[in-house]
A protein has these predicted regions:
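Solvent-exposed, charged/polar functional surfaces in cytosolic regulatory/catalytic domains
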Residues: 51-54, 58, 122-130, 169
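Bacterial N-terminal signal peptides
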Residues: 7-20
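Cleaved targeting-peptide boundary
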Residues: 21-31
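Acidic/histidine-rich alpha-helical segments that form the ligand environment
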Residues: 108-144, 151-163
């Protein structure tokens, strides 16, 4: 009985992780312009970008200042924190941020939905360009990293992990605020359509 439940749980978890209809699927469509490990990183960044952008669009403007507790980031601050990281972290591995950006204060710079979405979009474009610009030969190169040492390969892994952490945070926020993630809505619609077809 326990084995059966475990198998069902694994299937449900796996299906939930698969790209739904309408989502970016770099595992199938590829990552033009990059190869090897950088291609694997690019795929994860592309998926994160797609989900962040769709979630940011789905959150109503009046919810952008919502936060689950007084001492944590709001929706706006999470999205802008991710934007700042897409510049700051890639700058640490060799791709400077565009001049004129106030990265130290960007997180609290605005609560305007349209401006935040534009900032988030631009930051992911920068991140993808930075990955393309990295030579494969530099992946094992040692570098200073938060008071210690890391390789550029390890730094990219850190960046992917950081983005995933805040994507999960944003998904939890959206559920608490009564917003169903768009890809879940898509999956639910597809499931309902299949159920309706099976009854015909």
């Amino acid at each position: 009985m326990n084995h059966a439940l475990s198998a069902v749980s694994l299937i449900v978890f796996t299906v939930g992780m698969l790209p739904a209809t309408g989502q970016v699927n770099p595992y199938k469509e590829g990552t033009p312009g990059v190869t090897g490990y950088r291609s694997e990183v690019m795929a994860e960044v592309m998926v994160q970008e797609d989900k962040f952008m769709r979630l940011a669009e789905a959150i109503p403007p009046e919810k952008y200042t919502w936060r689950p507790a007084a001492d944590v980031r709001s929706f706006a601050e999470v999205f802008l924190h991710v934007s700042a990281a897409n510049y700051n972290l890639y700058e640490m591995i060799g791709t400077p941020a565009p001049s004129g950006l106030d990265l130290k204060n960007i997180e609290k710079s605005t609560t305007d939905k349209a401006k935040i979405i534009a900032t988030l979009k631009d930051s992911f474009a920068h991140a993808k360009q930075a990955i393309k610009a990295m030579p494969d030969a530099d992946l094992e190169k040692s570098m200073d990293w938060f008071g210690g040492k890391n390789t550029q390969r390890g730094a990219l892994l850190f960046i992917v992990r950081h983005g995933a952490e805040h994507l999960g945070q944003s998904i939890a926020y959206s559920r608490m605020a009564g917003v169903v993630p768009p890809w879940t809505v898509d999956a639910q619609k597809k499931k309902a359509e299949k159920k309706a077809e099976s009854k015909e």
